[in-house]
A protein has these predicted regions:
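Surface-exposed interaction patch
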Residues: 1-14, 59
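Predominantly extracellular/luminal cell-surface or secreted proteins
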Residues: 2, 7, 44-46, 68-70, ...
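Well-ordered beta-strand positions in beta-sheet-rich domains
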Residues: 11, 28, 62-64, 147, ...
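Long, domain-scale functional regions
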Residues: 7, 16-23, 31-33, 73-409
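C-terminal, structured domain-capping segment
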Residues: 23-74
């Protein structure tokens, strides 16, 4: 419509058949009482040189346009909100108690927790996000023939998923093992991508792929390229290389001088999680990896879970988690889903080697480790906000599944 009615620049595939088939062109279009609107419907015939279309010559396109009362298919997000009616928050100062100082492993099925996300240079303000924490059992998704767990929503409304594997009861919920970066003999190697190590600015030039990014990208190419249309290209994966408070990056002038990045303090390395204060914010655009961000550009819409996301989900640094486990390390049988696995969050430079946060499955806590060792890799990706819900209730036996379409939405 050109006079205030429904309008869109996207196209719907119309089936080519001798039998009349209903195709919905638009949902939730409304016309106020007493108002006249004019609509133009455009049909485009695609010229596909790989398909013999000679049978279509001389054929006629016909049909009827009509308006009917109906209900739009729910999005996956709307179904998640419906299935989890309870809202809660976690804080580092909840009436004097730090909720993030102890593991959250209580049953939380039916509850979504809320927080905010702000990406400096990308979002104009903080956006509310929903996340799962504790021992929830209804955040399972089956997508692209793999099982995933929902981590949270993102600033763009997309839904972030953590890889589980080919079955919900697996204990090998990873795509294999890789170093984060090899070698690890410079602070630049905490980067998912990185530049030269002259300064904090130059390591953020992001000209070189990390070892683990290359590993994940190859897996994506082999398994998920046909599903890219369902994935958000604006969702951000934050590889936070901000200096910690009181820390100075001076590697060029003093290579053996130790310093820590901001996640070291948010996870509270020094007092083992007692003052942990995780955040979904990303304070430098050059750390905010996404397909759309030219300052920190991904080749494919996939990366890793951050240490902050692990802390929000119920994990704590250097404190052993007992069963029942929080959802992010648990399979459907209640066992740990994977051996120790990488996060995306830098820890620091110890004067000789770079370190990154990981989930230590042997001790069941957040820990730091040299970037050069081989650890398990659990990819993370984000389903578009417009993705339609198909079936499922989020349980491992009946996971959420999405509507498959030509456009993705």
């Amino acid at each position: 419509s050109t006079n205030g009615g429904y309008s869109t620049d996207s196209y719907v595939d119309v089936p080519k058949s001798g039998t009349a088939t209903d195709t919905i062109l638009a949902y939730s279009a409304s016309i106020d009482v007493g108002v006249t609107q004019t609509y133009t419907v455009e049909f485009i015939y695609k010229n596909d040189e790989d398909v013999d279309q000679s049978d279509d010559m001389g054929k006629t396109l016909s049909g009827k346009l009509f308006i009917t009362e109906g209900t739009e298919e729910p999005t996956l997000l709307s179904q998640i909100l419906k299935d989890n009616p309870t809202r809660s928050t976690r804080s580092n100062n909840n009436n004097g108690t730090n909720d993030f100082a102890t593991h959250l492993t209580t049953t939380t099925t039916g509850t979504l927790f809320t927080s905010t996300e702000n990406i400096t240079g990308i979002t104009d303000s903080s956006k509310e996000v929903y996340y799962y924490a504790g021992n929830t059992t209804n955040n399972w998704v089956k997508f692209a023939n793999f099982y995933w767990r929902i981590i949270r929503t993102n600033h763009d409304g997309s839904i972030r998923l953590l890889y589980v594997g080919t079955s919900h009861d697996t204990t090998e919920g990873n795509i294999g093992k890789s170093a984060f970066n090899s070698p690890g003999t410079s602070p630049k190697y905490v980067g998912y991508k990185y530049g030269e190590d002259t300064s904090l600015d130059t390591i953020r030039n992001n000209t070189t792929d990390s070892t683990i990014k290359t590993y994940i990208d190859i897996w994506y190419q082999n398994n998920l390229t046909n599903y890219t249309k369902y994935l958000s290209t604006s969702a951000v994966y934050c590889n936070d290389r901000s200096e910690g408070t009181g820390q100075t990056y001076n590697y060029a002038s003093s290579p053996k001088s130790k310093f820590n990045f901001a996640p070291y303090y948010r996870m509270d390395y020094d007092t083992e999680g007692a003052t942990a204060n995780p955040s979904y914010n990303c304070t430098d655009k050059r750390d905010a990896f996404s397909v759309d961000n030219t300052s920190a550009k991904l080749d494919y819409p996939v990366s890793l879970m951050t240490a902050d996301e692990i802390a929000f989900a119920g994990g704590v640094a250097f404190q052993t988690m007992s069963t029942p486990y929080a959802w992010f390390i648990s399979n459907s049988a209640g066992s740990q889903v994977s051996s120790s696995w990488w996060s995306l969050s830098p820890d620091g430079w110890n004067g000789a080697r770079s370190c990154v946060w990981r989930w230590d499955s042997d001790n069941a806590y957040l820990n730091i480790v040299d970037v050069g060792i081989d650890d398990a890799v659990r990819p993370v990706l984000s389903l578009k906000s417009c993705i339609k819900y198909s079936t499922g209730n989020g349980s491992p036996e009946t996971p959420y599944e999405i509507v498959k379409t030509e456009s993705g939405c």
